[in-house]
């Protein structure tokens, strides 16, 4: 089956359509890459938020607990004999 000659604008054997499909594929790949980079940025933001909201306060609380529970070493010169 041949394509009607009256509807043929440029006889390039499908070159224009091939170029359009390649450009469409390149645009889709670029958009996918941008979306992937934005997802990675979102993961970084969530990681930093979790660190500032959870990890740092828990570390401060643990340091306060360690300071509170610190038992000084026995020093026989300071011992009181009753």
Swiss-Prot record:
It comes from the Viruses. Keywords: Apoptosis, Host Golgi apparatus, Host membrane, Membrane, Transmembrane, Transmembrane helix. One of its GO terms (biological process) is viral budding from Golgi membrane. It holds the Pfam family CoV_E. The chain crosses the membrane at residues 20-40. GO terms for cellular component: host cell Golgi membrane; membrane. The keyword Chloroplast does not apply. Residues 1-19 are virion surface. It is a single-pass type III membrane protein. It is found in: Host Golgi apparatus membrane. Residues 41-82 are intravirion. Belongs to the alphacoronaviruses E protein family. Homopentamer. Interacts with membrane protein M in the budding compartment of the host cell, which is located between endoplasmic reticulum and the Golgi complex. Interacts with Nucleoprotein. Plays a central role in virus morphogenesis and assembly. Acts as a viroporin and self-assembles in host membranes forming pentameric protein-lipid pores that allow ion transport. Also plays a role in the induction of apoptosis. This is Envelope small membrane protein. It comes from Canine coronavirus (strain BGF10). The gene is E.
């Amino acid at each position: 089956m041949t394509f009607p000659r009256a509807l043929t604008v440029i006889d390039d054997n499908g070159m224009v359509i091939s170029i359009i499909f390649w450009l469409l594929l390149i645009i889709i790949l670029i958009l996918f890459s941008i979306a992937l980079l934005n997802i990675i940025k979102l993961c970084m933001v969530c990681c930093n938020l979790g660190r500032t909201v959870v990890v740092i306060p828990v570390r401060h609380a643990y340091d306060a607990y360690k300071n509170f529970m610190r038992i000084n070493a026995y020093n026989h010169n300071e011992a009181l004999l009753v």
